[in-house]
Amino acid sequence: MARTVNCVYLKKESEGLGFQLYPGELGKRIFDNVSKEAWALWQSKQTMLINEKKLNMMNVDDRKFLEEQMMNFLFEGKEVEIEGYVPQKDDE
């Protein structure tokens, strides 16, 4: 049976992650409070951020920026802002 969590992002009970994907205390917080669906949404935003802002994951400042964006997105409900990005309309 799948593990469920009360997802802070989706604000509902949902299937949890299979294992802790992020290290440390923040990783435990994500594992305990973020659903698989919300994590997938974050991953797509993360990919867009890395590509559009040309972030280098070997750079400590870039990793810190990405972690801040992740916490804002998952726990504070703040949308990731990517310059020039226009979401596709449902009728397209």
Curated annotation (Swiss-Prot):
Entries under Pfam families matching the protein: Iron_traffic
Keyword ATP-binding among UniProt keywords: no
Top-level taxon of the source organism: Bacteria
InterPro entries found in the cross-reference section: Fe_traffick_prot_YggX (IPR007457), Fe_traffick_prot_YggX_sf (IPR036766)
Gene Ontology terms: cellular component: cytosol
Gene3D superfamilies xrefs: Fe(II) trafficking protein YggX (1.10.3880.10)
A single BP term in Gene Ontology: cellular response to oxidative stress
Iron in keyword set: yes
Keywords: Iron
PANTHER family given in the database record: FE(2+)-TRAFFICKING PROTEIN-RELATED
Family designation: Belongs to the Fe(2+)-trafficking protein family.
Role summary: Could be a mediator in iron transactions between iron acquisition and iron-requiring processes, such as synthesis and/or repair of Fe-S clusters in biosynthetic enzymes.
Name this protein carries in UniProt: Probable Fe(2+)-trafficking protein
